[in-house]
Amino acid sequence: LIYLLIGAILFGCQLNPSLSKSKLDIDRLSLIDEMIEKAIKKNKIPGAVALIAKDNEVVYKKAFGVKDPETGEKLKTDDIFRIASMTKAITSLGIIMLWEKAMIYSLDDPIDLYIPEFRTLKVLDNFNKKDSTYTSKPTNKKITIRNLLTHTSGMGYDEIGSSEIRAIIFKEKQKFMRNSVIAFSDEDVTIGEIVRRLAKLPLEFEPGVKWNYSNSIDVLGYLIEIVSGKTLDEFFKDEIFTPLGMNDTYFYLPEGKNSRLVKVQTKKEEKWVTFRHDRYNVNYPIEGAKKFYSGGAGLSSTAEDYFKFLSVFLNDGKYNDIQIIGKMTNKLLQLDQIAMITSDKHKGSHGLISTVVREEDLNKGNIGSAGTLHGGGYFNTKYFADPNEKVIGILLKQTRSISEHTSNKFNRLVFSSITQ
């Protein structure tokens, strides 16, 4: 009976037999189950899919909770999540691949060499809150590809960030779109049309002087289309998804996989309900024109697929003997690129792919080794990839308008399980 019970527990957790050899403490990892189940019981989250990989093998993969609040359908480990801003790392990798192949001359090239609409850049001077009118003045600097990769371009976002820039973008957007958030558009527009319009709007600050999370990776998605001669969707499939075997990652899901898309949930009167937004269609991965390839937030994926993507950065630029980028380039991606401009407002770091852990960050504890890449997405998805410990953690949820701490706890529990 004891052996049957142990077997049932291991099966339920989907623990890989290689876990015992992985230098991760099994007892400590079991605390992840306890933490997530407790969060579900206390109504903090409706569910999650968690994945942990060590030394190139998935050693833990488990689904918890409910996928659809209306039907009560349970989450499965191969369900598909809107990964939103986790798309950014994939788009940034695409830029690095083109740079490695000398299809982009330099990361310090001005973006206006490729997108002429950026030649007459202006920066915000004065803003009138009453009617969103503004004055602007010419910039002293040009936006470079590196600025775009590291969110130091001066651009903004239409859903988060500076209220002035949000208002300006929103006002411009109303001229050619319904009230939708750019990143999740289901309308009959292309990324090129959007970027060319954004290029004419004022920046929040001069390029290269501050960090500000922005639409800059959407600009880079359009740059990939210009340089490669392919749509961003085609480029991703040909150069990243097919080589890595990422068979469940899409801008728009094929009809046969629609049922695997997880519902976004929020709480209403302490009950989980399907989340809806008056400014965008939450079902954008399966509805609408299906023409808008947002390099900043448009992809949906699975935990397993994103593990394959992150594995590239833990293995000198390759996965399963498929070389995606060179070894030296991969080392470059682990370095902070914005140390010289870090301000009181933003004391963090950012590399060419994502946020990175620096030596001076290590005193915070349980955030990984120096060089660890980490990030997340708008619908409550998180990842990290530690190239020194060769450990990957992915926690996928689909929620909005709630506050909870399972992602931070997950990271801490994974790193504290490394005992050898």
Across the structure, where does each feature detected by a protein language model lie?
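Bacterial Sec-dependent N-terminal signal peptides
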Residues: L1-K23
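Short, conserved catalytic-motif segment at the N-terminal edge
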Residues: K23-I83, M103-Y105, V123-N128, Y284, ...
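Active-site SXXK
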Residues: I36, N56, R82-I111, I217-E225, ...
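A generic structural motif
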Residues: G65-K67, R279, T399
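Short, glycine/proline-biased beta-turn/loop segments that scaffold the active-site neighborhood
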Residues: Y105-F127, P243-L244
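Short, surface-exposed loop or secondary-structure junction motifs
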Residues: K122-I367
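Short, surface-exposed beta-strand/loop micro-motifs that present aromatic residues
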Residues: T372, F379-E389
